[in-house]
Amino acid sequence: MAAKEVLFGNDARVKMLAGVNVLANAVKVTLGPKGRNVVLDKSFGAPLITKDGVSVAKEIELEDKFENMGAQMVKEVASKANDAAGDGTTTATVLAQSIVTEGLKAVAAGMNPMDLKRGIDKAVIAAVAELKTLSQECADTNAIAQVGTISANSDETIGEIIATAMEKVGKEGVITVEEGQALENELDVVEGMQFDRGYLSPYFINKPETGSVELESPFILLVDKKVSNIRELLPILEGLAKTGKPLLIVAEDVEGEALATLVVNNMRGIVKVAAVKAPGFGDRRKAMLQDIAILTGGTVIAEEIGLELEKATLEDLGTAKRVIITKDDTTIIDGTGEQDQIKARVAQIKIQAEESTSDYDKEKLQERMAKLAGGVAVIKVGAATEVEMKEKKARVEDALHATRAAVEEGVVAGGGVALVRVASKIAEVEVINEDQKHGVVIALRAMEAPLRQIAANAGEEGSVVANNVKNGSGNYGYNAGNDTYGDMLEMGILDPTKVTRSALQFAASIAGLMITTEAMVGEVKEDAPAGDMGGMGGMGGMGGMGGMM
């Protein structure tokens, strides 16, 4: 086992604080509308330019192992805030730095670290409760656009495109962010349920100009097995021929004789038909077939539940207003399923998503939920260069997370004002000794730090701005974007409550642990021994050369 180096007491705390400051100082320059960019060197490709706190934090590794421990603990604050709310990483880092700095000063002055931590924890619990009372619902499109704009560093186009996407696919709908080909941002909305399976034969195409199949008011047959025998399909096809309506077959596969007969029938105009493979694999395929069945009011024909394809009738088929099938995708628009059943299915999938421990499963469940609930929106980010594209895409993703958080828990006044108001309301938290009281003071002072930093990044004196805001009331605050004071909500400067809450909770949690640290253990860095000159040893044999003379 390698030898270890141990630091105790003040020596450990000084090193840890140095690491905290290096990371936090690099991150906090990005805070606010006038925050600066940070350039990150990449081992390959162009450098990355970003204003995203967590992206900066993740890049930082320090040479001194003890300083690095401090930096890594603050990095954890940013990562946790990012995982929980998708934004607020810089705010969380600023809060953590303030709590650690003030806390370690108090410990050096002889206060009890455990009591300080208890005081900080009490203040945070009271602050979270107060934040909830200040929170206002974020329901309308305008408020959603404002939240997105603030999170995207005052880029109104990003806020507006996210608000439009949410309006079109619903607040539960799936919104994805991709790199686009144009200079401007674009929004593509897929209404209805789309899955990534195209037609099984190009002979089904009835719209040659677009290379797609379009079926108006079709019946939809859902089969959880491979279909290769045409006899199994005959009863359904005969029933359909009488109605004159088209048919979409969604099955594990349609092959051989069955596919050939369907193609011939389609080309002769006897029955308008198209076939696609069912989406997904294994259990996920069964679940997605059931989703389509509920959306279209049909029944999945599966032998394991005693239903045979030969005995299926028109009553077992689902229906929709329209189906569009391309080479790669199938879209079912306006399925005629019962709304109550669709809502129940969405609720069931939501519970599964909440209980799932796998990120991949969660993502797939949320996609299924969105497809049932309304559709999928794709924001295509436009930029002139690859460097700008990466920076812009990160901002759009941040803004999207922030708007989702705002819809979930509401909004509070932005620009660090909410935390200042909370601090003034909870000044009298109940404590049992002076050290705990000082812990509360440390937390309250930290709650002013984001506002001070926003002002400092805008070139103003943080203390003066903080004092002016404290003298006001309600949503009165400082707009660093145009250097004015006023009602933050009226100026459209909003922060999601969830983002502010998460930042405070994670910062206090990890900073509290750092304050109570008394020793640090790290590996001794051993210098690699210099390579010896052993390779020259073979020259000794030269002595025998004398015999040659």
UniProtKB/Swiss-Prot annotation:
Function: Together with its co-chaperonin GroES, plays an essential role in assisting protein folding. The GroEL-GroES system forms a nano-cage that allows encapsulation of the non-native substrate proteins and provides a physical environment optimized to promote and accelerate protein folding.
Gene this chain is encoded by: groEL
GO biological process, one term: protein refolding
Binding site for ATP: 30-33, 51, 87-91, 415, 495
Pfam families according to UniProt: Cpn60_TCP1
Record lineage: Bacteria, Pseudomonadati, Pseudomonadota, Gammaproteobacteria, Alteromonadales
GO CC annotation: cytoplasm
Localization in the cell: Cytoplasm
E.C. number(s) listed in UniProt: 5.6.1.7
Similarity section: Belongs to the chaperonin (HSP60) family.
InterPro entries hit by this protein: Chaperonin_Cpn60_CS, Cpn60/GroEL, Cpn60/GroEL/TCP-1, GroEL-like_apical_dom_sf, GROEL-like_equatorial_sf, TCP-1-like_intermed_sf
Protein name: Chaperonin GroEL
Major subcellular location class: cytoplasm
NCBIfam families named among the record's database cross-references: GroEL (TIGR02348), PRK00013.1 (NF000592), PRK12849.1 (NF009487), PRK12850.1 (NF009488), PRK12851.1 (NF009489)
Subunit organization: Forms a cylinder of 14 subunits composed of two heptameric rings stacked back-to-back. Interacts with the co-chaperonin GroES.
Domain of life: Bacteria
GO molecular function: ATP binding; ATP-dependent protein folding chaperone; isomerase activity; unfolded protein binding
Record's catalysed reaction(s): ATP + H2O + a folded polypeptide = ADP + phosphate + an unfolded polypeptide
